[in-house]
Amino acid sequence: MPSIGPIPTIPDEGSRGSSATAAPRRAMASYRDTTLGGRAEGVAFSAVEDSYTSSVSLARMLYGGDLEEWVRHTRPGVSLEIQSRAPVRFPPPNNPSSRRVTVVRAPMGSGKTTALLKWLGEALDAPDISALVVSCRRSFTRTLAKRFNDAELPGFATYFTSTDYTMAGEPFRRLLVQIESLHRVDDNLLNNYDILVLDEVMSTIGQLYSPTMVHLNKVDALLTRLLKTCPRVIAMDATANAQLVDFLASARGERSVHVIINSFAAPGFSQRDGTLLRTLGTDVLRAALGFVLVDDENGTKVMETDSRPISARLREVNSAGFFGRLMDRLVAGRNVCVFSSTVSFSEIVARFCSQFTDSILVLNSLRPSEDVAFWGGVRVLIYTTVVTVGLSFDTAHFHSMFAYVKPMSHGPDMVSVYQSLGRVRELIHNELLVYVDSSGARAEPIFTPMLLNHVVSRQGGWPAEFSQVTDALCCQFKARCGPAYRTASTRGLALFVRFKYKHFFERCTLASVGDSINILYTLLESNQMRVAIEGCQFPLTAAGFCDFLQDLRLDAYAARKEIKQLRGPGGIAATPTEVFENDDVAVFIQKYLRPGVAHDEILALLVELNSPIVREQFVNVAVLGACLRLPAALESPEVFAGVYKHYASGVVPVISDAGALESVSITPDVNVLARWDLYKSCTRHARDLAWDPSRGGSGLDMSEDFITNTLSADYNRFQSLLVEIAKCNVTPLEMLAAGAVRGVTTALSGRPKSRVPLSKGEHAVSLFKVLWEDVFGAKLAKSTQTFPGGVRVKNLRKDEIVALLESVNVNHSECKTHRELYALLMCNRKLFAGPRYKLRAPKWSRNLCFLELDNTGTCKTPLDAALADLAPSAWPQVYGAVDFDAL
């Protein structure tokens, strides 16, 4: 573990002395009194509020590990039932003493849905009793419908069987609906349901934050109303937490709420042993696929084909790591299932496994789905998060499970990973082997881990300095989340605003591989699984955990280049005729692109737009260009909203991973005012830098001081907006300026020891980089030119040399000729020696209709049409302008 040095004595609050831990202690004190808005905003505070500011217990609290203690201390009027050693049992529905609302927290495989079916069978004892079941996903709705049918629960319809958009009348009095279609249920029905069921309730609420949630305001209002008024409510989840119970107790009264906490887990989970692996083993992968690394003439490692038999190739590699262990089990004739958090890796694993068996089933977004009943017919099952809640394979067919998890800013989050790992209920050898790829974690120093592993803490193994620093970081994160979504745009959203902290936590912690591991560790243990780290003896120590993170980081970065080379080339199956005669493509070209873009460039763009991240950034660049062309958008929130919704709504054509042309719906962010706030500053940046994607990016070089000054006016606001818009939690400069904080956070990031404080300039450059990269896809690159500007030294004109000399206050009055000025400039070249940066535009943005050009006009017409319905009063009034609204 990187040494943090001796832990000094912490001075009393009144002391003027300094210490390595003074900064984190001051930060803790600074953030201690900042809350998420109190109970009025729905954050469940226990009697000991430190759960939100404890780096050890935060994950456990957010996933309901402290629910029993919290109910006893904070909501004593809520009835509490503790169950263990047996599957979930519901109170009889017809018992007069039964409460109106029942919340069930129980692990996967504890019989929650089975108990629900039994309860509904008794509760629906009369044909006039109605019920609404709200699920988180379409696939889960189908699974529930099948189970309801198998249980012979009569009269249930599903929303996808409705022939009309609005579901109304007797056929839908018993209905299963996915939350995103809740607005399609007729109000008369919604006001009269007798029973509301939310299976996987936390995932259902989490769906409110999905970019596919088109009717957020209406769905939020309807679900809130149902939770407050429906006569009987059943809410179940393995991670049901205090926030949920607190909301229901506030809405219905404590005496109406009954909480069941069941700790039983089926043997398929409770006897499962999980191991976090240190290495991926790309040497085994490379050998199996028939490649070998050789040195080229420059000494660089390159991959070449190895034509030897596979047995000869594999004899030369060490069968360790993820692929080595997978190979051993396949060679031994065992059946394995493999979870991959990315589609591309699932395809690589399929190619690897095909060297040992032909009996392989791959379930991802590129391939057709397959009924769970057929899983038992293959030796190897490979799946992604397309297989999630609702699907269960209960047969003891697979011997072992492997999991590849790559935390990335766009997900999947660790709860989704955990849910996918639970789809195979029985493993013959009860073996789960997990490799967490850290190459997708954020490398910028302004992103820091904030969680400590609870197992190390259980053994008393974390130094006090680690706890103080990470607790302060948790306080900072809590304070950062508090003001989010408090604008007129989000007014009226009850559940969306109330559960925001958990959403931010799950997204922001994806920046850190250590945080992601600690969350997954917590979730697996909550399901009664035993988890260990390869190479770490019991008890797990702080040094052992940090060494593991360092090994993991080094292995992942070494493997990343090889994985990229081994990835199969993609192709475009759609023909040019099919693409360019498509109506959605025609509308897209007119709406977003400048005239005359070549067909091959458009095809390349559609391939890039298959990425959800690129789609978001593409829209953001389009909006930025519109704000530069239409300054009124920066003066009026109504005009900006019109511009933003024009570009962020509708459909975008993409070329999928399979090469097919598809149309993807896009939905504007609900928090338009926060985006307006951000764009006002970013438009100023773009104007000052002469940033134009069609010309490759910025027209000027930037020094560290220039970037610092550019951000200074809105520095803190940028950090807050990045949480709301990009789901990035930037650690503030005042914390990273402390050597102790730097020492702890580098150790928890698996990086070499560094107690060197981050300077103001370094923090500003990193913040600027993240802002433009995450929101607009731009890259901040160091300039290699001797002098600022885009002109080579030998091509500098006289006036350009004068401008350079004056920029560093060099007197040039004695120099009259170009030769003299040039000589003076070269004599003072050291004044330009500091690092300078260029802001490069992403390649996919270069054909966007960005700035007003002589031949532009196509993208202006649809934008003008979109803004035509704005009231005259929405447009800013300038001096001398006529106020048409007043005429």
Swiss-Prot record:
| Oligomer status and interactors | Homodimer. Interacts with the major DNA-binding protein. Interacts with the DNA helicase/primase complex-associated protein and the polymerase accessory protein.
Intracellular or extracellular location(s) = Host nucleus
**What residue stretches are annotated with the Helicase ATP-binding domain?**
93-258
Nucleotide-binding: present as a keyword of the record? yes
The organism's taxonomy opens as: Viruses, Duplodnaviria, Heunggongvirae, Peploviricota, Herviviricetes
Q: Which domain of life is it from?
A: Viruses
Function summary: Functions as a docking protein to recruit essential components of the viral replication machinery to viral DNA origins. In the presence of the major DNA-binding protein, opens dsDNA leading to a conformational change in the origin that facilitates DNA unwinding and subsequent replication.
Predominantly, its location class is host cell
Which SUPFAM superfamilies has this protein been placed in? P-loop containing nucleoside triphosphate hydrolases
Name a GO CC annotation attached to this entry.
Answer: host cell nucleus
Protein family: Belongs to the herpesviridae OriBP family.
Protein name, per record: Replication origin-binding protein
One GO process term, biological-process aspect: DNA replication
